[in-house]
Design a protein with these regions (language model features):
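Extended, low-polarity transmembrane helix blocks
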Residues: 1-35, 52-57, 61, 68-135
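Membrane-interface interhelical connector segments
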Residues: 34-52
């Protein structure tokens, strides 16, 4: 049986691990759009100043900042909004349920980023290092 006290001491580290994984996965979306790696044919010829291009900038820069845990709360808040907008612009017109309109990932990212906006970066982050030095 799990001892809740022993689980609680690991919570900041698990939060940090979740943040690192989500940041890495998210920055890949921006990398595919802007850098062409990994190559996804639908992003060939993407204009930087289009909505998809601007989303790519947010995904690449924001995903990197989330990955390293720098400015986590404000960046996560912005990315949560970006994913909510992406859902309502690109997926919601295809139907009410995310499983039917292929919007599950946008919804999931939106709420995970919203969680990070409130919970912070956790351990293993630049935010935690800078906060220790300023206290």
């Amino acid at each position: 049986m799990l001892n809740m006290q022993s689980c609680e001491k690991w919570t900041p580290y698990v939060l940090g691990l979740l943040r690192i994984i989500v940041g890495f996965l998210f920055l890949q979306h921006g990398s595919a759009k802007l850098l062409g790696t990994p190559h996804i044919a639908m992003f060939d010829g993407l204009q930087l100043m289009s909505l998809m291009g601007l989303a790519g900038i947010l995904e690449l820069v924001g995903g990197t900042l989330i990955l390293v845990g720098l400015f986590t709360r404000p960046v996560a808040f912005i990315l949560s909004g970006q994913m909510a907008v992406a859902y309502f612009m690109a997926h919601a017109p295809g139907g009410f349920l995310p499983i039917l309109n292929q919007g599950e990932l946008a919804v999931l990212y939106s709420f995970v980023f919203l969680y990070f906006a409130f919970a912070g970066a956790g351990k293993l982050s630049l935010d935690s290092i800078f906060c220790k030095k300023s206290n």
